[in-house]
Swiss-Prot record:
Function: Contributes to K(+)/H(+) antiport activity by supporting proton efflux to control proton extrusion and homeostasis in chloroplasts in a light-dependent manner to modulate photosynthesis. Prevents excessive induction of non-photochemical quenching (NPQ) under continuous-light conditions. Indirectly promotes efficient inorganic carbon uptake into chloroplasts.
Subcellular location: Plastid, Chloroplast inner membrane
Name of the protein in question: Potassium/proton antiporter CemA
Reactions performed catalytically: K(+)(in) + H(+)(out) = K(+)(out) + H(+)(in)
Species in which this protein is naturally found: Guizotia abyssinica (Niger)
Glycosyltransferase keyword on record: no
Length: 229
């Protein structure tokens, strides 16, 4: 009976890690053909933001210039002009396909991430008992660690998240999340998040040390500041 009680929270933890990912992947595969068909056949309007519109126009102009340059070095004939029109037509269709694939990717990834969020919310609402057990295990594990190890772990975590070299890591992480949700890459938004998010985390962490750690474990705060200095 005791083994069963101990096994249930572990099974719950494993399901939190793998089940949302598995269900969202299954959902994405099952909806991919339907979304592709809907977008390519029934979507009459094309929604472009400024970045996408500029990118597609630049690619089209570059393509047109290359094809015209290629034809300029040849003899002008009706056949060559016809080939030029066919080439522009084919590449235009290819650009449209690339744009459609990007839009389909956005819809699918955004939908699957919403599903993951709903599943995790359901876990937090209906799995309160298992979460309490897991929380008690984590607190017991942290309580058994020495203050030196705790201070070292805090220092390592803060250096990784808000240290001198952290902006590059945040840039990669935010860019990955941004891409995972299917949004178009935007350097201005990503750089803005990279410059503000670590500052907010640093403020929250210092407030947490001041309000919580000073009251619970003053010795840990002393060791942490000694290591940090």
């Amino acid at each position: 009976m005791a083994k069963k009680k101990a096994f249930t929270p572990l099974l719950y933890l494993a399901s939190i890690v793998f089940l949302p990912w598995w269900i969202s992947l299954l959902f994405q595969k099952s909806l991919e053909s339907w979304v592709t068909n809907w977008w390519n056949t029934r979507q009459s309007e094309t929604f472009l933001n400024d970045i996408e519109e500029k990118s597609i126009l630049e690619k089209f102009i570059e393509l047109e210039e290359l094809l015209f340059l290629e034809e300029m070095i040849k003899e002008y004939s009706e056949t060559h002009l016809q080939n030029l029109r066919i080439g522009i037509h084919k590449e235009t269709i290819q650009l449209i396909k690339i744009h459609n694939e990007g839009r389909i990717h956005t819809i699918l990834h955004f939908s699957t991430n919403i599903i993951c969020f709903i599943i995790l919310s359901g876990y937090s609402i209906f799995g309160n008992k298992e979460l309490v057990i897991l929380n008690s295990w984590a607190q017991e594990f942290l309580y058994n660690l020495s203050d030196t190890i705790k201070a070292f772990s805090l220092l390592l975590l803060t250096d990784l998240c808000i240290g001198f070299h952290s902006p590059h890591g945040w840039e990669l992480m935010i860019g990955f999340v941004y891409k995972d949700f299917g949004f178009v890459h935007n350097d201005q938004i990503i750089s803005g998040l990279v410059s503000t998010f670590p500052v907010i985390l640093d403020t929250i962490f210092k407030y947490w040390i001041f309000r919580y750690l000073n009251r619970v474990s003053p010795s840990l705060v002393v060791i942490y500041h000694s290591m940090n200095d």
